[in-house]
Amino acid sequence: MELLKRLCNTSLSRRRAVSSVAVTAAAAACGWQSQTKAAPGSWQPRYILASAMYGNFPLAEILPEVAKIGATSIDLWPKPHGTQREEIDTHGEAKVRALLAEHGVTLGGIACYRLGPFNLADEFALAARLGEGVTLVTGARGDAKATGTALKAEIKRFLEKLRPSIATAEETGGILAIENHSNSLINSSDSIRWFGELVTSERVGVALAPHHLPQDGELVATLARDLGPRLKFVYAQQHGKGSKEKLPKADELLQMPGRGPLDFGPLMRQLAEMQFPGPIEIFMHPVPRGVPILDTVPAITAEINRSRAYLDDFVAG
């Protein structure tokens, strides 16, 4: 068993050229059989493909990969993480709409960290023209060092400033998800819970990012449970050895589910119990930002499928 685990953590990362089907099959055998699965049910994860995983590869080369990772929608990332959001500006909405239709893909999300939470009116309008119920993910603004009652008051102030963006989300039928992020107002367990409690719009909630939380699978699952319907988006990404400094590729990939030490089982079982309807995005940050996580499109897709097999094993019937 120990040899099998070592093989899973090393040899798979070197076989970048194998097919996604082969990697998925190998992943299912990589030492996870001892972990408890969720009770069988009808729930299946609704995966969304992050364009940033492919760096600066063009959208035309990425869209065929959506179905290969068991997804139907794509999350467009702008610079510095990807270049696919900019393709709407350079190629035009009509061409991007045609590309999406050609591959049977829907626009499921747009990463809006650069725009911030208060400048989303145009992006919501764009999203409504290209898709339906599109999730815009961004960060919070406010005193990230506040605690206790001061933190709760800071979240209330943030929500007051957020009212125009909330109204736009409601008017356009979009979803606004605020990610818990280090050095952000929404970064601690308390801030996540209070934000979820204080939000009143059904179209606003949290993009849960385990990467920026203590690496405790039970804690992450508890936060998902406590958020309930305010949980709008899940990043399937762990901290691993971090994502700020250049690391050997094997260490960089420890952010991926099934590679690093974080147990995603509690979270996946909780999502199944909740019948979570939102997107789940298998994700990691390369260093430097904007490069593909691996050298080729097939290798990237295979790596995503490796993590997908690991996550799916927890909810397999």
Question: Could you tell me what each predicted segment is?
Answer:
Residues 62-79, 130-131:
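Catalytic domains of carbohydrate-active enzymes, especially glycoside hydrolases
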Residues 31-56, 64-65:
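C-terminal segment of N-terminal export signals and the immediately downstream linker at the start
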